Amino acid sequence: AVATAKAIETTGTPGSPSATTTLSGKQLPAPDPKFGGVIKDGALQSKAWWAPRIVPPKQAPNILLIMTDDSGFGVPSTFGGVIPTPTMERLAKTGLRYNNIHSTALCSPTRAALITGRNHHSAGFGVISEQATGFPGYNSIIAKDKATIGRILLDNGFATSWFGKDHNTPAFEASAIGPFGHWPTGLGFEYFYGFVGGDANQWEPNLFRNTTQIYPFQGKPGWNLVTAMADDAIDYLNRVNQIDPSKPFFLHYVPGATHAPHHPTKEWVDKIHNLHLFDDGWNKLRERIFENQKRLGVIPANTQLEPWPTKVIKNWEDCTAEEKKLFIKQVEIFAAYEAYNDYEIGRVIQAVEDMGKLDNTLIIYINGDNGTSAEGGLTGTPNEVAWFNGVSLPVEAQMK
C-alpha cells in the first residue's frame, strides 16, 4: 500500500538501542532497514548497530473503536429510542453524531470492511464466514495485501487489541488448534479476548485469550461475558499504561450484544422492567421514536411515517392480554441487554479517563453492525438455535 509521505521523527543515538523513528508512510509495510554498523574479522574492530525502534508520531491519539451487534437505528436513546444509553449519549454530546453511516446487512461483511477500510468483497467477505464459497470475494479470507487497521497501527508502534466478537476468521480455521493466521492475533492485533463466530452464550461462551481456550465462568454462576470483557479490556489498558505510558493504544471493542442470544443479568432486566418503557405497545412506541428522531434532527423534519403493516403484524390493541405480556417481556430482555452493554462500555471509557488519556483518545461508537436483526421471526423466539434450524415457535407455544 502507498500512503502520503510524512516527515520522519527520530530520537536517541543512531544505531543504539535507544534510537527510535517514525514511518514516512511512503511504503507499508516499511522495508527492513539496512545494517548500519561495521563487521570485521575481530570483535574489537566491528561496530554493533541496532535498527531504530518504530514509534508513533508525537501526540498520536489513542483509538477506541466500538461496534455493537444487531442494534437498530431507533434502538438507543441517543438516536431517539427509549432504551437508555448514557455512555453513547455522553459521547454524542461532546463529539459528533453521524446518521448517514452505511453498513452491510450481515455481520462478517461489515466487520471486514471496518477493519480493512475496503469494500467487503475486496476483503473476501461477500457473506458471513459460515456461508463462504470458493470464489473471489466470498471465501472469507482477508488476504495479506488487505492489511487491517490493526496491522497498520501495530507496524507504526501502537499497542493493538481486539475484544469480543471475531466473525472474520474462516469457519474452517475456527479451531482450538488453528491455523491461526486469520485469527485477530494473525491480523495485526497483539491481544485478543473473545469468541470466534457469529454469536455466543454470554454465560458460558466459547472463549479464547489470544488462541488459547479459557473457562473463567466455571464455578461462577453470576459470571457474564459482557462484564468480563470490560474487565479484561480495563486490565489490558492498565497494563499498557503501566509498562509504557507513552505508547498509544488501538482497542477494537466489539461485544456480542445485542445479537441473540439475549443474556442480560437479572439486575438489568429488573431495571428495565421497572421503567415500563413498552407498556403502551408497539404502535405508540413507533410513533414516539419517530417524533424523537425528528426532534433530534437525525431524520428530516418533513419525514412521513409509513402506515402500520397490519397484513404482517396486527395492531397492539388487537393483541390478547397474554400476547402483550409475552411481547413486553421479549423487548424488555432485549432492552436490558442493550442498556447493560452500554453501561459496560462506559466502564472502559471511564478507565481511559482515569488514566488521564481521554482528551487524547479518538472514540468511535458504532450502534450496530447491520441494524436490528430479523432472526426469530416477527413474533420472536425463546430458542435461537431452533429458529436457525427452521423451527418457528408460534405465540401460543411460547406462552406455555
Model segments located where?
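Short acidic, Pro/Gly- and aromatic-enriched capping/linker segments at domain boundaries
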Residues: 4-20
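Formylglycine-dependent sulfatase
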Residues: 21, 26-400
